[in-house]
Amino acid sequence: MTQATQIRRIGFDMDGVLLYNPSRIFRALISRSKQAHLFPRKELEFYHPNTNLEKLLWVLVHQSSFKMADGFSDLENFAHNNQVELNIVSARFSCLQADTRKWLKRLNRQQIFTSCNFNDLDEQPHLFKARMIDELKLDYFVEDNFDVVHYLATVQAKTEIWWLSNILDQHIAYPHKFVNFKEVVAALSQNK
């Protein structure tokens, strides 16, 4: 296969990337509080809901992903007009399966995604994403959580990790940083 006809494999996180989620700005605050040791957890250990009440609260918190990201229709056009393989790689825990299925019907309404991969076994999100990036042999992966971006960029030599930033993290330098999803799709369109 020549370089001109090579299919690019691209992966997208769901919450905060494909789905607009204004509460994602709080991730920066949570990350900083972990760095300041305000929480007794490791930097890259994500909370997992265990009790029924915790799972209910987790479902309610994820209602903040309330619409498709601005630029999603641009992604659909991009998918139909380019040699690409698009994949969803979401670390949503299994307690969110019903909501995830609902969103998947809307996100894949034009059958643009080759695969939709969800964290049904409740692995740590960064480890799940690293494993899926390897299995899918992705060329690019778009993520909105900088802690995950930093981890993946460290362990994924063959995959370019793109960061969909937020207003609280604008001071952080990163080579593949975007402020909105429309920018991501525009960059993918130019990056042939």
Residue ranges and their predicted role:
Residues 1-63:
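Active-site neighborhood of HAD-like aspartate-dependent phosphohydrolases
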Residues 2-6, 80-81, 134-137:
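Flexible, charged surface loops at secondary-structure boundaries
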Residues 13-14, 91-92, 145:
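Short, well-ordered beta-to-alpha junction loops that form the rim of enzyme active sites
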Residues 21, 89, 164-166:
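Generic beta-sheet signal
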Residues 50-54, 60-61, 66-69, 73-75, ...:
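Glycogenin-like
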Residues 56-64, 113-120:
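Glycine-rich phosphate-binding "P-loop"
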Residues 60-88, 94-99:
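Short, acidic loop-to-helix structural element flanking the phosphoryl-transfer center
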Residues 84, 96-192:
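C-terminal cap/substrate-recognition subdomain and adjoining C-terminal extension
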